[in-house]
A protein has these predicted regions:
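Extended, charged helical/alpha-beta scaffold domains that provide interaction surfaces
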Residues: 1-172
Length: 172
């Protein structure tokens, strides 16, 4: 990270921009780095120290890293080095929400199991978000009407109105 900091500092001075007096918090720094290192993210497998990375890459955090023992679920690496294994060097903990916001234009969204949700009185579905084949969000409940209004309407008619699952005070 020091080398990246040095390069950025030199560019800021060269551009004539003024430096902030306040140090940036951890989240801001790593969100900024994430935008340029999306191919170097990984999610830890449930068993062992292996991380599943983007584009089907598997790696481990290098033995010299302080993160090696921490076993965070999501990490980003400044460098992936391949020897007999692929090692993540200069790694840091990240949150999956950061990935989604940094890669909004690159993530793929898959919607499944649209259904009538009586408790919220809306047609809901589940969303799976992936980036380069890596699942960022597995099963998030969403309002399906914004995704597919036509199918949402059909589900509403079949599962809410015909099945008399829709509760309203309106007179029909």
């Amino acid at each position: 990270w020091r080398e990246i900091h040095t390069q950025l500092h030199a560019q800021v001075i060269e551009m004539g921009l003024r430096l902030s007096d306040k140090p940036a918090p951890y989240e801001q720094i790593h969100r900024a780095l994430l935008a340029g290192l999306l191919g170097n993210i990984g999610c830890r497998d449930l068993e062992g120290d292996t991380y599943q990375g983007a584009r089907e890459i598997k790696f481990v955090v290098s033995s010299g890293s302080g993160l090696r023992k921490q076993k965070y679920k999501w990490v980003i690496a400044a460098e992936l080095q391949e020897t007999n294994r692929v090692y993540a060097r200069t790694a840091a903990k990240i949150e999956p929400e950061w990935i989604e916001s940094a890669a909004e234009h690159l993530v793929k969204r898959h919607y499944f199991d649209p259904h009538w949700e009586k408790s919220t009185a809306q047609v809901s579905a589940y969303e799976r978000v992936t980036l380069y084949g890596l699942t960022v969000t597995l099963k998030r409940r969403i309002h399906f009407g914004a995704v597919d209004p036509t199918q949402s309407r059909e589900i509403f008619i079949r599962q809410a109105l015909v099945a008399q699952e829709y509760e309203t005070r309106a007179t029909f």
